[in-house]
């Protein structure tokens, strides 16, 4: 009977440890989810800013006339 009580106690300890681990991991998932949402917002802002940039008035290298010595 003592062996059974010891096994039950061991299982209760393992369960308590697993519950604690799950709580810690749950908090990490929440933090990472918040971080991901923030980074997605920053990326959307950056994309918006890049799309609103005026194209350069300088000609591309393909549009440039070659120098006279060619």
From Swiss-Prot:
Gene3D superfamilies: 1.20.5.300. Pfam families: SlyX. InterPro entries: SlyX. Disulfide bonds: none annotated. Transmembrane segments: none annotated. Belongs to the SlyX family. PANTHER family: PROTEIN SLYX. This is Protein SlyX homolog. It comes from Shewanella woodyi (strain ATCC 51908 / MS32). The gene is slyX.
């Amino acid at each position: 009977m003592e062996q059974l009580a010891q096994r039950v106690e061991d299982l209760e300890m393992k369960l308590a440890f697993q519950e604690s681990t799950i709580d810690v991991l749950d908090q990490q998932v929440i933090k990472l989810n918040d971080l991901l949402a923030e980074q997605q917002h920053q990326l959307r802002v950056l994309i918006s800013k890049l799309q609103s940039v005026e194209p350069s008035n300088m000609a591309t290298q393909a549009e440039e006339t070659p120098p006279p010595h060619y």
